[in-house]
């Protein structure tokens, strides 16, 4: 038998597995989007309900600005990139959500600071002294511009982006956070991560903005890479502004899912920059390292928090399994495999995806449970709340469906020619 035949059979089997996952992911994306379209739209005031029980019933009508922005972004991205989602109902809901944000998100217009929580009809309830409501507001406006062509949305996005950059790099006083003498000058990884995500968002197919924010993107990547500490053996969630480890629990804190999400943000940056050396570093430190330290050897799934010195983490939910770290891990491993071809990363994608689909998805009512015990049992039956909306699950499924489709569209390698039998006269 030709030596090339088993290899060809292996490749065909791999393609069958990729195709099966593409179909499985696509069907799940349809179910998840249908859940949010059926249960979350506020037809009276615009925007979205995110506090939804298992069956989709609204248990609280407060509106969280960052989740409003995420859902607008998600709907517009689906509308733009998938033919089956290109229908008026989805875009109209996104526009209604965008208009709700334009009217009510900012606490004291023309100031840019956004509320964290609004009443159903848009009155501010709470403000956070962070940049995250504003970041998702920016993402929403940019995607609305891309989906509708209405320039006013893009103007809003760029103005808010420039305000965020000012807060982060020049003067944070506008966030309202007091400078306390005993507080360490800490940099959470979330800040450069979020900015890098915005750089990618605004620069997509836009040479002018890509050029404007190119230096910022490099700055963000450097700041994220500073979180690799202890001679490359740990990625820490918080470091000093100078890139050094901080003392105490804050300094030892690790979040494997967040590191994996940072990993695929950095991978996109590497791909755009054409930097294979950085890509290899990112795969090693931001994909493989957090997975091997963060995967529960007894019950499967990723721990939510860890302590770099193996003390018991102080967060009560540290051992729980949450939906979003697993969504981000699926994206990270599939993106890493798509770019590097390393079969180890594909096997890890399958491992995480099998666990995630088995434990989190709700085959009866749709969408995914968000909060499981360490053993993988449902701890909270809600499908949405102050921190879970229409974002991590559909973003994961949409990106994975696209990446799986791209892998399947690649031509299969040509089989190696069979060796020519040696001539007996030459023996």
Swiss-Prot record:
What changing residue 396 to S does, per the record, is:
Activity is similiar to wild-type
Q: Report the record's disulfide bonds.
A: none
Q: Would you name any one GO CC term?
A: extracellular exosome
GO molecular function (one): N-acylglucosamine 2-epimerase activity
The UniProt entry's sequence similarity note says:
Belongs to the N-acylglucosamine 2-epimerase family.
Protein name as catalogued: N-acylglucosamine 2-epimerase
Q: What segment(s) does the record annotate as region Leucine-zipper?
A: 195-216
Tell me the pathway: Amino-sugar metabolism; N-acetylneuraminate degradation
Q: Which organism is it from?
A: Homo sapiens (Human)
Record-linked InterPro entries: 6-hairpin_glycosidase_sf, 6hp_glycosidase-like_sf, AGE/CE, AGE_dom
The upper taxonomy is: Eukaryota, Metazoa, Chordata, Craniata, Vertebrata
- Entries under SUPFAM superfamilies matching the protein: Six-hairpin glycosidases (SSF48208)
State which Enzyme Commission number(s) the record gives. Answer: 5.1.3.8
The annotated site for Important for enzyme activity falls at: 390
Phenotype upon changing residue 400 to S = Activity is similiar to wild-type
Which Gene Ontology BP terms does the record give? carbohydrate metabolic process; N-acetylglucosamine metabolic process; N-acetylmannosamine metabolic process; N-acetylneuraminate catabolic process; regulation of blood pressure
Gene3D superfamilies listed in its UniProt record: 1.50.10.10
Q: Pfam families given for it?
A: GlcNAc_2-epim
Give the gene symbol: RENBP
